[in-house]
Amino acid sequence: MPVFALLALVAYSISLALIVPGLLQKNSSWRRMAILSATIALICHAFALESRIFPGGESGQNLSLLNVGSLVSLMICTVMTIVASRNRGWLLLPIVYTFALINLAFATFMPNEYITHLETTPGMMVHIGLSLFSYATLIIAAMYALQLAWIDYQLKNKRLAFSSEMPPLMSIERKMFHITQIGVVLLTLT
């Protein structure tokens, strides 16, 4: 029974249920509970993936496409939760958590298996690790680009009211540029 996966799915759902109405109503009292629920989801997600990727014994690592996708979504969620805990990036959290919820559900409930032995080839392990980190970093940069385009569109069409929740466009652009640079460096190292 995938107990940790089910706990993570419930915790991601609770986080989404707290974040989405809070973003629409500009209410910030929900943030602490949303971060707590997201932290529980991340921990349970990590334990669920650990048991799926390392099934035990000398059988190797299960690096199926769904497990790797769920691992990437875990990395993205971890970074975005850390960013959100500093009162930034809240607009992207529903997208990130929904992505993680779907990936974890597919990885848990759909049978998939691709066993490999990375301990025999450390170069391949470094290559896969750097690839996963660069992929996660570039996805975060792409989400910042979507946020930048959405806010720019809303401002040009005079549909977005100014609030303290809306980050400045220049700071989003600067973050996006730095994150893209980090992703390109990681991809080059891969």
Regions found by a protein language model. Give the residues of each.
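Structural signature of hydrophobic alpha-helical transmembrane segments
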Residues: 1-11, 60-73
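Hydrophobic transmembrane alpha-helical segments in integral membrane proteins
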Residues: 1-15, 130-138
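Loop-to-helix transition at the N-terminal end of transmembrane alpha-helices
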Residues: 27-44, 61-68
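A generic, lipid-embedded transmembrane alpha helix
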Residues: 37-53, 105-108
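Transmembrane alpha-helix/helix-exit interface in multi-pass inner-membrane proteins
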Residues: 133-158, 186-190
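A mid-sequence, solvent-exposed acidic-amphipathic segment
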Residues: 154-190
